[in-house]
């Protein structure tokens, strides 16, 4: 199964494509669509739609995972984000993809074991789960990859994690995995 995770934004939209062909997670592609703030909002939505349509044609995912909308202090930003989400959802439906939406807290819980994890902790776990040599940048990308991984964990459940560096066997859960991989643990920022 191939899942496309999307972290939507009107100026920066992250994407991550993850597969589980052989029972292991594999990152197929990831990146960020950086949009020109000088263009109109509808023009940026059109660029997102076209770029993701090309990506879907190329990687042929079966599912699309997208972050749910949240309302912060800036209502105008929330409305613009909602329009981007709507375009991405419409594209997924048009292309016949199974669509799942996840709240940020649910994604963090699925990937790190903590619903209140920082973006840096999510990035660290994404890197560990996929056995990557370095953390993909920027955080919009790791958030999108985390959305794809969350979808796989919620809908497939029995996918193996790569072995932690220096371990001879798979651990008995997240606590042991983190203990065996101290170099992958990212501490939350102190305020």
UniProtKB/Swiss-Prot annotation:
Supply the InterPro entries for this chain: RNaseH-like_sf, RNaseH_sf, X-over_junc_endoDNase_Mg_BS, X-over_junc_endoDNase_RuvC
Question: Quick one: which residues bind Mg(2+) 2?
Answer: 67
State the similarity comment: Belongs to the RuvC family.
Q: Which UniProt keywords apply?
A: Cytoplasm, DNA damage, DNA recombination, DNA repair, DNA-binding, Endonuclease, Hydrolase, Magnesium, Metal-binding, Nuclease
Query: What's its job?
Result: The RuvA-RuvB-RuvC complex processes Holliday junction (HJ) DNA during genetic recombination and DNA repair. Endonuclease that resolves HJ intermediates. Cleaves cruciform DNA by making single-stranded nicks across the HJ at symmetrical positions within the homologous arms, yielding a 5'-phosphate and a 3'-hydroxyl group; requires a central core of homology in the junction. The consensus cleavage sequence is 5'-(A/T)TT(C/G)-3'. Cleavage occurs on the 3'-side of the TT dinucleotide at the point of strand exchange.
Subunit info here reads: Homodimer which binds Holliday junction (HJ) DNA. The HJ becomes 2-fold symmetrical on binding to RuvC with unstacked arms; it has a different conformation from HJ DNA in complex with RuvA. In the full resolvosome a probable DNA-RuvA(4)-RuvB(12)-RuvC(2) complex forms which resolves the HJ.
Say if the entry is tagged with keyword Transmembrane. no
List, alphabetically, the CDD domains matched.
RuvC
Q: Which domain of life is it from?
A: Bacteria
Q: What name appears for this protein in its UniProt entry?
A: Crossover junction endodeoxyribonuclease RuvC
A Pfam family annotated for this chain is: RuvC
> What is the organism field in this record?
Chlorobium luteolum (strain DSM 273 / BCRC 81028 / 2530)
Q: Which cofactor does it need?
A: Mg(2+)
GO terms for cellular component = cytoplasm; Holliday junction resolvase complex
- A biological process (GO) annotation for this entry? DNA recombination
What's the catalysed reaction? Endonucleolytic cleavage at a junction such as a reciprocal single-stranded crossover between two homologous DNA duplexes (Holliday junction)
Q: Does the keyword DNA repair apply?
A: yes
Q: What class of enzyme is it?
A: hydrolase
Which residues are listed for Mg(2+) 1 binding in this entry? 7, 140
Q: What Enzyme Commission number does this protein have? A: 3.1.21.10
* Gene Ontology molecular function, alphabetical: crossover junction DNA endonuclease activity; DNA binding; magnesium ion binding
* Active site annotation, chain numbering: 7, 67, 140
Cellular compartments annotated: Cytoplasm
**Cofactor: binding comment:** Binds 2 Mg(2+) ion per subunit.
């Amino acid at each position: 199964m191939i899942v496309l995770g999307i972290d939507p934004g009107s100026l920066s939209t992250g994407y991550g494509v993850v597969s589980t062909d052989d029972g292991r997670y594999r990152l197929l592609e990831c990146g960020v669509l950086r949009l020109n703030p000088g263009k109109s909002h509808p023009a940026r939505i059109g660029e997102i739609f076209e770029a993701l349509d090309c990506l879907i044609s190329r990687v042929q995912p079966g599912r699309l995972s997208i972050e749910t909308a949240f309302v912060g202090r800036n209502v105008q930003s929330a409305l613009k984000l909602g329009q981007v989400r709507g375009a991405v959802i419409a594209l997924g439906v048009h292309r016949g993809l199974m669509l799942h939406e996840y709240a940020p807290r649910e994604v963090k819980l699925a990937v790190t074991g903590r619903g209140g994890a920082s973006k840096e902790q999510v990035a660290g776990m994404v890197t560990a789960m996929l056995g990557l040599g370095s953390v993909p940048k920027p955080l919009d990308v790791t958030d999108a990859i985390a959305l794809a991984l969350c979808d796989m964990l919620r809908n497939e459940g029995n996918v193996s994690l790569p072995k932690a560096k220096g371990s001879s066997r798979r651990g008995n859960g997240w606590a042991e995995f983190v203990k065996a991989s101290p170099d992958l643990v990212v501490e939350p920022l102190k305020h």
